[in-house]
UniProtKB/Swiss-Prot annotation:
Taxonomy, superkingdom: Viruses
One GO cellular component term noted in the UniProt record for this chain: host cell nucleus
Entry keywords, A to Z: Activator, DNA replication, DNA-binding, Early protein, Host nucleus, Phosphoprotein, Repressor, Transcription, Transcription regulation
GO MF annotation terms: DNA binding; DNA-binding transcription factor activity; nucleotide binding
Localization per record: Host nucleus
Record's subunit section: Binds DNA as homodimer. Interacts with protein E1; this interaction greatly increases E1 DNA-binding activity. Interacts with protein L1; this interaction enhances E2-dependent replication and transcription activation. Interacts with protein L2; this interaction inhibits E2 transcriptional activity but not DNA replication function E2. Interacts with protein E7; this interaction inhibits E7 oncogenic activity. Interacts with host TAF1; this interaction modulates E2-dependent transcriptional regulation. Interacts with host BRD4; this interaction mediates E2 transcriptional activation function.
An example Gene Ontology biological process: viral DNA genome replication
The protein's name: Regulatory protein E2
Family label: Belongs to the papillomaviridae E2 protein family.
Organism placement in taxonomy: Viruses, Monodnaviria, Shotokuvirae, Cossaviricota, Papovaviricetes
Predominant place of localization: host cell
UniProt key word Transcription: yes
InterPro entries reported for this sequence: E2/EBNA1_C_sf, Nucleotide-bd_a/b_plait_sf, Papillomavirus_E2_C, PPV_E2_N, Reg_prot_E2, Regulatory_protein_E2_N, Regulatory_protein_E2_N_1, Regulatory_protein_E2_N_2
Species the sequence originates in: Human papillomavirus 7
Length: 375
């Protein structure tokens, strides 16, 4: 028993010296795991002999000592293999060679230079998870080691070795766990990467009169939008000049946005995608008689990053709209409202109807229809 206690003390003294040394050399970290293995073997032997204490140290169970010894052997052998490569000359910290980092994703690889990747599920900043993107991943291929760069895209975190790509974090699977929709936004520093779900919802159609394999869904959606587009009475209002209060005379070039009243924030929803009533037709005649030109628009409102991602996806179906604005906000809005706005313009009401029929707008983005009039 005393002999085992002396060996344990000697082993632990060597470990303390290595911790205090805080070396950056791989050979010292190999020694660290060698002494961890010795310590576990001493504990295992003592437990087999029925000894439960060695000095002031409590002897772990056989299973614990055995598992720790196996882990130490694995780490020592992998580090010795890594030492035979050119990566031996790189600085290595105790943390770089720890078992916790060895078993972190991607598992069974050495990793350095972690960066935080934020993933917002449902495009909600309050429903975000953080993952680690490694700038250097050391992968063992047969008897040698290869250093590759960790990468990120809309699908997840991955690395590529000899043309073979391995994803160690799949954002799609994570979205099923943490999200309610199949939308997510990836933020890496100043970069914003969007999920592919809504891209799939934006069919890159040929001219609309050509039948497409997905035409069944598009036809159904068209039927829905061809029907009267009803909104709650509190938010739906057709603008009629004959009932409006007198306005100041506009100069040429002034803008009148009938979709939104800038003073009150009330929204006026255009009904151009349905059969128009005589009042609306006469109203348009009044506008046109004054030399004005009305452009159908859709106003999108939501999280700024989510809107930017959606606008980027829309470039795949740019034939379904005319122009897209940058993100903007009302200056009179409450500071607590962090939503941004994007305005899309269309050459005709028919083009806007096609857009609504073929494009899936995420549930996290509100949209309103309207007319932009230039007098």
């Amino acid at each position: 028993m005393e002999k085992l206690a002396r060996r344990l003390d000697l082993c632990q003294e060597q470990l303390l010296e290595l911790y205090e040394q805080d070396s950056k050399q791989l050979q010292h970290h190999i020694l660290h795991w060698k002494y961890i293995r010795y310590e576990s073997v001493i504990y295992y032997t003592a437990r087999q002999m029925g000894i439960k204490r060695l000095g002031h140290q409590v002897v772990p169970s056989l299973d614990v000592s055995k598992a720790k010894a196996h882990a130490a052997i694995e780490m020592q052998m992998c580090l010795e293999s890594l030492q035979t490569t050119e990566y031996n000359l790189e600085p290595w910290t105790l943390q770089d060679t720890s078992q916790e980092l060895w078993l972190a994703e991607p598992k069974k690889c050495f990793k350095k230079g972690g960066k935080t990747v934020e993933v917002r599920f449902d495009c909600n900043e309050h429903n975000a998870m953080h993952y680690t993107l490694w700038t250097a991943v050391y992968v063992q291929v047969e008897d040698t080691w290869t250093k590759v760069e960790g990468q990120v895209d809309h699908r997840g975190l991955f690395y590529t070795v000899h043309g073979c790509t391995t994803y160690y974090v799949d954002f799609g699977k994570e979205a099923h766990t943490y999200g309610k929709t199949n939308d997510w936004t990836v933020i890496v520093g100043s970069r914003v990467i969007c999920s592919p779900s809504t891209v799939e919802g934006l069919p890159i159609v040929a001219p609309v009169d050509i039948r497409h394999p997905a035409a069944t869904d598009a036809t159904d959606a068209t039927k829905v939008h061809d029907a009267p587009y009803a909104l709650p009475a509190s938010t739906t209002k057709v603008y009629n000049d004959s009932h409006a209060p007198p306005r100041k005379r506009r100069r040429d070039g002034d803008l009148s946005i009938s979709a939104v009243d800038g003073c009150s924030g009330r929204k006026y929803v255009d009904t151009g995608n349905r059969a128009r009533s005589p009042d609306i037709e006469s109203n348009n005649k009044i506008r046109n008689s004054g030399g004005g030109h009305s452009t159908p628009i859709i106003q999108l409102e939501g999280d700024a990053n989510c809107l930017k991602c959606f606008r980027y996806r829309l470039t795949k179906v740019s034939h379904l709209y005319t122009n897209s604005s940058t993100t903007w906000r009302w200056t009179t809005e409450s500071r607590t409202n962090k939503n941004a706005i994007i305005t899309l313009t269309y050459s005709s009401v028919h083009q806007r109807s096609q857009f609504l029929a073929l494009v899936k707008i995420p549930k996290t983005i509100k949209h309103s229809l309207g007319m932009l009039t230039i007098m």
